[in-house]
C-alpha cells in the first residue's frame, strides 16, 4: 500500500515501488509484467473525487484502475465499506444453508451443527475484525445470515423470530460482539508476543510510554489509544480500535490475557460479552 500526501509524492512513490518490485523479481528469476499490474485507490468519497488519475496514466500507462480487489479471500473496495465483500459472502452462505436444509432430515443434530459451523460460521468469522466500524446496515446483513443458520439448527420456520432464549441455547454472540471478540483476541496475542511484529508495535501499554512512569492505568493493563481525526479511516484502524476495545474490558478479564491460557481468556471474554450485549432480534 502506498500512502502519499500530494501528486508529486505519489508519482515518485509509485515509480520507486515498481522498480523495487521489479528488482526483487529479477533477483529471484522472475519478471514483472506491467501489462497485468493493477491498482486500487483508497480514500473517502471526497478524497476519491479529488484524485488525479492522469498522474498514474502518465507514470505507468499500462496500469489498470480497479474499484475493488480480492486479497486473502476478502474483497476490498475503495471506500472500505466492504459492501461487495458482504454481498459475496451472503450469496455464498445462503447457498450453503439451502444445501444443508435439503439434507437436514438425513443428519443428526450434532452433524448438522458441525456442518453449519464449517460452511457458514467459519466464513462469517474469517477476517471479521476488519469489519469493525462498518455501517449498521452491513452488520444487519451479516446478522441475518446468523439468524437463518440458527433457524436451521433449531428446525423452526424461516419466518420465526429468533429470541434471546434461542441465542442463549446456541451460545452464539451477535455479529457486533463477534467482531469485538476477534479483535480483542488479536490484541491479546499482541500482548503475549504471538502476533507479528507489525501488529505488536500497535498495542503499547501505558507503562511503556515515553515518560516510563508507572501509573494506575499501567496496573490495570490499559493500552495507549492514538488520537485520530477521521472516523472511517482513523478509528477503524487496528492501532485505534484494538486498544480502544481492550480498554473497555474489565480489569480482571484483561489480566487473564497474560496470566492464563488462551482458552481461559476466551471463556472469560465471551462470558463478559454475553453479559453486556443488548439483544435486538
Residue ranges and their predicted role:
Residues 1, 25, 69-79, 93, ...:
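Short, conserved catalytic/metal-binding micro-motifs enriched in Asp/Glu and His
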Residues 22-40, 138, 143-207:
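Short, charged alpha-helical motifs in flexible N/C-terminal segments and linkers
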Residues 62-130:
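Basic, alpha-helical interaction scaffolds
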Amino acid at each position: 500500500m502506498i500512502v502519499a500526501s500530494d501528486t508529486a509524492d505519489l508519482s515518485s512513490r509509485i515509480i520507486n515501488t515498481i522498480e523495487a518490485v521489479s528488482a526483487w523479481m529479477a533477483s529471484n528469476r522472475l519478471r514483472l509484467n506491467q501489462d497485468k499490474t493493477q491498482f486500487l485507490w483508497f480514500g473517502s468519497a471526497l478524497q476519491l473525487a479529488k484524485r488525479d488519475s492522469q498522474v498514474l496514466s502518465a507514470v505507468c500507462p499500462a496500469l489498470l484502475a480497479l474499484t475493488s480487489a480480492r486479497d486473502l479471500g476478502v474483497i476490498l473496495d475503495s471506500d472500505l465499506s466492504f459492501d461487495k465483500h458482504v454481498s459475496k459472502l451472503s450469496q455464498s452462505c445462503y447457498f450453503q444453508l439451502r444445501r444443508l436444509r435439503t439434507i437436514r432430515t438425513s443428519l443428526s443434530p450434532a452433524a448438522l451443527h458441525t456442518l453449519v459451523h464449517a460452511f457458514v460460521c467459519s466464513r462469517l468469522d474469517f477476517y471479521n475484525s476488519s469489519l469493525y466500524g462498518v455501517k449498521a446496515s452491513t452488520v444487519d446483513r451479516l446478522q441475518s445470515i446468523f439468524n437463518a443458520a440458527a433457524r436451521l439448527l433449531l428446525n423452526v420456520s424461516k419466518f420465526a423470530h429468533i429470541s434471546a432464549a434461542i441465542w442463549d441455547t446456541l451460545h452464539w454472540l451477535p455479529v457486533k460482539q463477534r467482531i469485538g471478540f476477534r479483535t480483542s483476541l488479536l490484541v491479546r496475542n499482541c500482548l503475549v508476543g504471538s502476533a507479528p511484529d507489525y501488529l505488536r508495535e500497535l498495542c503499547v501499554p501505558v507503562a511503556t510510554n515515553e515518560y516510563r512512569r508507572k501509573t494506575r492505568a499501567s496496573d490495570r493493563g490499559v493500552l495507549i489509544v492514538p488520537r485520530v481525526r477521521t472516523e472511517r479511516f482513523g478509528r477503524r484502524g487496528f492501532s485505534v480500535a484494538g486498544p480502544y476495545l481492550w480498554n473497555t474490558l474489565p480489569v480482571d478479564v484483561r489480566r487473564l490475557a497474560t496470566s492464563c491460557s488462551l482458552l481461559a481468556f476466551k471463556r472469560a471474554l465471551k462470558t463478559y460479552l454475553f453479559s453486556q450485549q443488548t439483544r435486538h432480534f
